[in-house]
């Protein structure tokens, strides 16, 4: 495959990506199609039964108009249920979570602006906030990556590992740490706190949040009629989890992207030719790495004067 032209490599990568998309669509169609059709038939049967029972006092046209209004409100995150103890969607904690979902591109979709002014503000806010967020993430990544790489460097020196092995061990350790602290542990907490949530749904929510998929079909404490203080506490906890978890996920992804195996795969699809100085910058060989970590045994002699 090394003899392929660059355009053929890109075409191969594109075809593999499209094939993966098609395979995912076929699997989801097979898994989700029957339950969706069953739910649709169940709703239609219940609606027909309700119309037959209350046809005299509630015409079908009025019922359809009422359901349409309820669904339109639900699309903007406005619930029509009588949860009087739950606060408004646009209180301060909910608004903070909404702005965080914009700046992190998570976009849970549980609420959306109704007014034209709100929609215009979201466009301007995202256009200015997303580049600022990317710059902040780049600065934090540059600051935190050396800190998280110190344990891996110590292990590499202790066990006399090759640079490629040390990088792989460091990436695996950081990935396992992020998976346990920001994926498994929050999922267990969510599973224990939210009674109507299974462990699979909790893991599904955590992964959807940290991967910025943000499907929004599950949101902790949303629509449960909780006391306002508990609801606000849950919103702030979710906000902190989203910000810290995304930063940890980006650090793990950056560590994996620097692996020699990953760089070799990326280089395979890049333009052929000799490696540039930028590719070689900061790369030490095994002998250089060993010399840089061993202190000299002999003291440094000062300048001698001629006799």
From Swiss-Prot:
One of its GO terms (cellular component) is monoatomic ion channel complex. It is a multi-pass membrane protein. Residues 92-118, 199-227 dip into the membrane without crossing it. One of its GO terms (molecular function) is potassium channel activity. It is found in: Membrane. Glycans are attached at residue 83. Residues 1-10, 141-172, 254-307 are cytoplasmic. Keywords: Glycoprotein, Ion channel, Ion transport, Membrane, Potassium, Potassium channel, Potassium transport, Transmembrane, Transmembrane helix, Transport, Voltage-gated channel. Detected in embryo, eye, lung and liver. Weakly expressed in colon, testis, atria, kidney, intestine, bladder, uterus, ovary, salivary gland, thymus and brain stem. Not detected in brain, cerebellum, spinal cord, heart, ventricle, skeletal muscle, liver, placenta and pancreas. In the eye, highly expressed in the retinal ganglion cell layer and inner nuclear layer. The chain crosses the membrane at residues 11-31, 120-140, 173-193, 233-253. Probable potassium channel subunit. No channel activity observed in vitro as protein remains in the endoplasmic reticulum. May need to associate with an as yet unknown partner in order to reach the plasma membrane. Homodimer. PANTHER family: POTASSIUM CHANNEL SUBFAMILY K MEMBER 7, POTASSIUM CHANNEL, SUBFAMILY K. This is Potassium channel subfamily K member 7. It comes from Mus musculus (Mouse). The lineage of its organism: Eukaryota, Metazoa, Chordata, Craniata, Vertebrata.
């Amino acid at each position: 495959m090394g003899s392929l032209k660059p355009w053929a490599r890109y075409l191969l990568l594109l075809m593999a990506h499209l094939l993966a998309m098609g395979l995912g669509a076929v699997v989801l169609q097979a898994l989700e199609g029957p339950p969706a059709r069953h739910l649709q038939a169940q709703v239609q049967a219940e609606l027909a039964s309700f119309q037959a029972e209350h046809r005299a006092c509630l015409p079908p046209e009025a019922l359809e108009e009422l359901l349409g209004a309820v669904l339109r409100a639900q699309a903007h995150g406005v619930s029509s249920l009588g949860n009087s103890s739950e606060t408004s969607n646009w209180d301060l904690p909910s608004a903070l979570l909404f702005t965080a979902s914009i700046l992190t591109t998570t976009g849970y979709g549980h609420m959306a602006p109704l007014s034209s002014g709100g929609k215009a503000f979201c466009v301007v806010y995202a256009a200015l906030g997303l580049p600022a967020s990317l710059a902040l993430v780049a600065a934090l990544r540059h600051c935190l990556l050396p800190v998280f790489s110190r344990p891996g460097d110590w292990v590499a020196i202790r066990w006399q590992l090759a640079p490629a092995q040390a990088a792989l061990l460091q990436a695996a350790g950081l990935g396992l740490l992020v998976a346990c602290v920001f994926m498994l542990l929050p999922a267990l907490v969510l599973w224990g706190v939210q009674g109507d949530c299974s462990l699979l749904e909790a893991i599904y929510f955590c992964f959807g949040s940290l991967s910025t998929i943000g499907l929004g079909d599950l949101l902790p404490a949303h629509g449960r009629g909780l006391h306002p203080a508990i609801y606000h506490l849950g919103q702030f906890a979710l906000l902190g989890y989203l910000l810290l978890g995304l930063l940890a996920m980006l650090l793990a992804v950056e560590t994996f992207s620097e692996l020699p195996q990953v760089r070799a795969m990326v280089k395979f699809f890049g333009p052929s030719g000799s490696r540039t100085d930028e590719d070689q910058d900061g790369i030490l060989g095994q002998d250089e790495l060993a010399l840089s970590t061993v202190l000299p045994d002999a003291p440094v002699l000062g300048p001698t004067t001629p006799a």
